[in-house]
Amino acid sequence: MSIERTLTGRASRHVLPDGIIDTQSHIYAPDFPVMPGGPGLPIGMPDEKQYRRLCSWLGISKTVITVANAYQRNNDCLLHVLREFGADARGVAAISPNITDQSLMALIDQGIVGARIMDLHGGAYNFSHIKNLDQKTSANELMI
């Protein structure tokens, strides 16, 4: 199924401040399959290029991308998108409370600034993980 999206047009009558940040988005890349335990991919999901076009039209210059529940504990799609977007994007990843310091630093080096906790059905890490995860994230100045 294809969804027709308006990604460009007349300039908005509301001018956004320079440097405005979209602080919550999910991006699905077709080369990354869903993981067991999570929901499926959205029908007619927008891709990276569509999202970038929309941001350009709206005047959004930076973004924070959150790993989607469809990918569960697999951050590969998120890290791919961060590489594609470069300095204009940061990420919120699914981070195990048992992650090694070395693995956590590798995520930070790739643009991860926070850990996702999702207590709804299909979330990779729920609130039962928050105490142990908080110790790891706060020590590295990450958001949770």
Predicted regions and their residues:
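Active-site gating/metal-coordination segments in enzymes
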Residues: S2-E4, Q72-I144
